[in-house]
């Protein structure tokens, strides 16, 4: 699937005391509300729609009010996650939590409920970021077991806003 949005790519190097590069984190940020590149949008990805029944598992995880500041240590210096004025310019009332942090909470919920705590068993976690999580929000992950290897899921906040949708996890035996 192709997204017709501009992307800003940033590399952040983590070095030891001697200046030796330990790792390089590469971040991509989509610029919302921009685009206009023309052409066909292209095909959509698979539709992982929750079934019309109660979830088989629900995990609630509380984020911390300072979570974005802590998560910034990963090297993601996007001011959208820390600067209230920048967040307002982007159309938010306050800074938003990193999508990767929200994704991590959801991955942890799947690993906890369907992988016996073994992260090696989570082979694929496919999601669409569809809303925002604010630092201090509760992330509620709802999961439906479709088979031993396939879990359909979605995540929402305590406000009821779906923040990760069209989501599925593939689990190894």
Tell where the protein language model's regions lie, with residue ranges.
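Hydrophobic beta-strand-centered segment that forms part of the acyl-chain substrate-binding groove
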Residues: 1, 104-150
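C-terminal accessory segment of soluble enzyme catalytic cores
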Residues: 89, 96-101, 126-129
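HotDog/MaoC-like acyl-thioester-processing domains
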Residues: 1-58, 135-136, 140-173
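Catalytic strand-loop segment that frames the active site of acyl-thioester-processing enzymes
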Residues: 27-97, 111
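A residue-level detector for conformationally permissive "hinge/kink" positions
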Residues: 83, 91, 123, 128, ...
């Amino acid at each position: 699937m192709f997204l017709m949005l501009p992307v800003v790519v940033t590399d952040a190097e983590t070095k030891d005391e001697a200046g030796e590069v330990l790792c390089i984190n590469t971040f991509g940020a989509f610029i919302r509300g921009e685009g206009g590149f023309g052409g066909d949008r292209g095909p959509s990805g698979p539709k992982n729609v929750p079934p019309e029944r109660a979830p088989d598992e629900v995990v609630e995880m509380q984020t911390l009010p300072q979570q974005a500041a802590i998560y910034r240590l990963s090297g993601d210096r996007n001011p959208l996650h820390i600067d209230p004025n920048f967040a307002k310019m982007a159309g938010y009332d306050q800074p938003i939590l990193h999508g990767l942090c929200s994704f991590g909470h959801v991955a942890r919920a799947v690993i906890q409920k369907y992988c016996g705590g073994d992260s090696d068993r989570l082979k694929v976690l496919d999601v669409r970021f569809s809303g925002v999580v604010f630092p201090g929000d509760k992330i509620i992950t709802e999961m439906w077991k479709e088979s031993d290897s396939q879990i359909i899921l979605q995540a929402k906040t305590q406000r009821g806003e779906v923040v990760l949708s069209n989501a599925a996890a593939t689990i190894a035996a």
